[in-house]
Regions:
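Residue-level signature of catalytic and energy-coupling elements of molecular machines
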Residues: 9, 46, 60, 86, ...
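Acidic, low-complexity intrinsically disordered tails
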Residues: 361, 366-386
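Gly/Ser-centered flexible loop/linker motifs
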Residues: 103-129, 283
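Interdomain boundary/hinge elements
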Residues: 19-32, 41-44, 71-89, 117-130, ...
Length: 386
């Protein structure tokens, strides 16, 4: 409490950040003592209290006297900079590993999160199985997704997009710019400069403090996706980075996306070592022998820039009598295992990240090859019409 006295049963005025005033009544005043709370009749300035009975109270609102309301200065909450679609997991493996799989389960959990996560924004969409979620960056939304999967939720996540604004004066496109601060040993500074420079970052300040370099950049929010993991790899885990919202500024241009295509499974079943032995020469595998896969799942990165439809479940043919019983030595490279952040950075517009309590899989939005071809033709027609 900042000022005054509040009592059980007292009428109060809730003043919102936008100036809206709502009358309410305090049902109970609870005073914090140690790790617990005790019911009290009244509380005074300086006390840390919990008020029971107030509805629709948000962080930044002031609870005032209804006769002479004097609200405190509202805490400014940084606007969301990143958005992605949370949708129902409609893959063939739906319901195998998770407990909460329906759109209602996901929607209820997200709206419950709004009560405590003030930087989160949720919007309904025309698709009843999808909901648009905006937050303060990939780390902010990644923590939410990780918490949900640990609670037993299954969901599909789309490629993250930054929230662009339109300049009212010039009509140009403005994008969120973050202020990035990095502390790194001098010997590893080159890797940081290269990483940030390739992602449209601009150096603002640099200090050398006894072999430890302090770097400050401005960088587009979209270019921060996956930067932390790559920076730790480039600096052997010695870099410490922090960023916060800086401003909206003119867009700094396109950043090169994924250079390679992917290998997409054409059938479902268990991955076979014989098939992987033939495929690993053409790319980097994401799955290991005996892993279950389904049609439309991304199983590897192609060495070329185009997508390839493959069958990772193919077994060795038993038609040749001389080679059927031969013991062939198959040596497979370890598959690449992605974290949630790496997976969200990796996918393209026509792909999704399937998140379950036990697995993180990459998949195409359209699971069958025929559906993907139809979607591609439709996109070409729409582009010509525009």
């Amino acid at each position: 409490m900042y000022n005054g006295v509040i009592k059980t049963g007292q009428q109060v005025m809730i003043v919102r950040r936008d100036g809206e005033k709502i009358k309410s009544k305090v049902q109970q005043v609870q005073l914090f003592e140690g790790l617990g709370r005790v019911n009290v009749e009244d509380a005074r300035a300086g006390d840390i209290v919990a008020l029971v009975g107030l509805e629709s109270v948000d962080i930044g609102d002031s609870i005032c006297d209804p006769i002479n309301p004097q609200p405190l200065e509202a805490t400014e909450i940084e606007p969301p900079t990143l958005t992605m679609m949370f949708s129902v997991n409609d893959s063939p493996f739906c319901g195998r590993e998770g407990k909460y799989v329906t759109s209602r389960n996901i929607r209820d959990r997200l709206f419950k999160e709004l009560e405590s996560n003030v930087a989160l924004k949720i919007e309904e969409t025309t698709d009843k199985d999808a909901i648009k979620v905006s937050g303060r960056g990939l780390l902010h939304l990644g923590i939410l997704i990780e918490n949900m999967r640990r609670e037993g939720y299954e969901l599909s996540i789309s490629k993250p997009h930054v929230i662009m604004h339109k300049d009212k004066e010039t009509g140009g496109v403005l994008e969120p710019i973050e202020y990035l601060v990095v502390d790194v040993p001098e010997k590893n500074m080159g890797g940081v400069m290269e990483l940030v420079g390739n992602r449209k970052g601009e150096l603002v300040r640099m200090d050398n403090r006894a072999g430890q370099v302090h770097l400050e950049f401005t960088i587009p929010a979209r270019c921060l996706i996956g930067l932390r993991t790559r920076m730790l790899t480039a600096t052997q885990g010695t870099a410490v980075m922090h960023h916060n919202f800086h401003e909206y500024a003119p867009a700094r241009g396109e950043v090169p996306g994924r250079a390679n295509g992917v290998m997409v499974s054409m059938s479902g079943g268990a991955v076979n070592a014989y098939a992987l032995n033939n495929l690993q020469e053409r790319g980097v595998m994401f799955v290991a022998p005996t892993d279950p896969v389904y049609e439309g799942q991304i199983v590897a990165e192609n060495s070329r820039d185009s997508d390839m439809v493959v069958n990772p479940t193919t077994a060795k043919k038993l038609s040749n009598m001389r080679t059927t019983g031969s013991d062939e030595n198959i040596i497979l490279k370890p598959p690449r295992k992605m974290t949630l952040e790496q997976a969200l950075e990796y996918i393209e517009e026509d792909e999704l990240v399937e998140v379950t309590p036990q697995s993180i899989r990459l998949r195409k939005t359209k699971l069958t090859e025929s559906e993907r071809k139809k979607a591609g033709k439709k996109a070409v027609v729409e582009m010509v019409e525009v």
